[in-house]
């Protein structure tokens, strides 16, 4: 009788014991930092970035000697970097970037001499850049930006003075 109880106990708890001992690599990564592949481009600071779907985009920046205008796409599923079409505007650092409706946007920044206020759209499907209406605020760098409900927002930053103004951009109306 005691052997039957032990057998029933083992049969009942064996799946729990086995599943508790299983190792799922994905679980090991939840809530932890882990290294992914290094970008193939130049090391840099003051770059800009946005995400579309499961891909991250890194644009422009400064390598310590020059301002950059390259664009890189990180594919999180493949853990790979691919160079995309270079940003056609003035090379810069400290620009803002955001995604709105599956397109990326980049604008403002500093080219070493001028505070910039131009604004550009990146289409990842066609790998092309198109200039959009200039940002109506003063040229600036170090601003903040985000995309919400089909609009891009840019504000704050520095143009010789610290700023707190905000503007919204409607991609459909290009204004």
Stretch-by-stretch model annotation:
Residues 1-8:
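Bacterial N-terminal signal peptides that target proteins for export
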Residues 11, 15, 21-175:
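Kelch-like beta-propeller repeat domains
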Residues 5, 18-19:
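Hydrophobic, helix-prone linear segments
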């Amino acid at each position: 009788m005691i052997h039957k109880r032990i057998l029933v106990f083992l049969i009942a708890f064996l799946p729990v014991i086995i599943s508790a001992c299983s190792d799922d690599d994905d679980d090991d990564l939840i809530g932890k930092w882990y290294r992914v592949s290094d970008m193939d481009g130049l090391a840099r600071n003051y770059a800009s970035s946005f995400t579309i779907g499961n891909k991250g985009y890194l644009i422009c920046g400064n390598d310590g000697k020059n301002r950059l205008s390259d664009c890189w796409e990180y594919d999180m599923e493949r853990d790979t970097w691919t160079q995309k079409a270079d940003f056609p505007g003035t090379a810069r650092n400290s620009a803002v970037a955001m995604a709105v409706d599956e397109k990326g946007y980049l604008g403002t920044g500093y080219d070493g001499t001028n505070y910039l206020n131009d604004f550009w759209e990146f289409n990842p499907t066609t790998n092309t850049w198109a200039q959009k209406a200039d940002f109506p605020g003063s040229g600036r760098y170090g601003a903040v930006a985000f995309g919400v409900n089909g609009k891009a927002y840019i504000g704050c930053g520095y143009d010789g003075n610290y700023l707190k103004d905000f503007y919204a951009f409607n991609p459909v109306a290009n204004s």
